[in-house]
Amino acid sequence: MNTLLLVGLGNPGKEYLNTRHNAGSDFVRMLCNDYQVSLAKEKLVHGCYAKFIINDFSIILCIPDTFMNESGISVSKAKKFFKVDSHEILIIHDELDLHNGCIRLKDSGGHGGHNGLRSIIDHLNGDSSFKRMRIGIGHPGKNKDIVSYVLNKPSESERKNMEDKMKSALPLIESLVINGWEKTIMKLHSSEEKKDES
């Protein structure tokens, strides 16, 4: 059976719930609700996980209990625990360089300044071949404001827009399994471009 490990990045603790930096872990929780599965703690992966099946794919949802800057600890442990290759991992994370609620898929690449991705690449010994789902949170405008910006909660209107866009992106996981990576990317990005034009 094929496997796809989805890891939603964020910071643990109630004080970080619904902050911009936790967009990835928020998306995984939405998936859990959508597929009616519960997350269970697992010390060996430094986080919690849930599993379900789509066609012949075993889908594993994981949220690290490490802080964002140490995400690589959990991802490397989960990779070993679930016996998956890097290309079978989809990291879901917040993205400053995309406007609020914009969803993009990316097949490998660098860390782009994202400390969670930086940690993952470091703990995978430089391997950056894992896939990514980038959830736009917008940019504060000034680099000196980034830390406080990502660790704070968005406005009510921003939050609603982000939640609506993330909910509409939930079917992407099934599409990845049924239609494959390339077709799913083309469909997602073409629909986003049409929205931008309208």
Model-assigned labels for residue ranges:
Residues H111:
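Conserved TIR/SEFIR loop-to-helix hotspot centered on a Trp-containing motif
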Residues H114:
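Glycine-rich phosphate-binding loop at the start of an alpha helix
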Residues N2-D107, R118-M133, P140-D145, N152, ...:
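Nucleotide and nucleotide-moiety/phosphate-recognizing core
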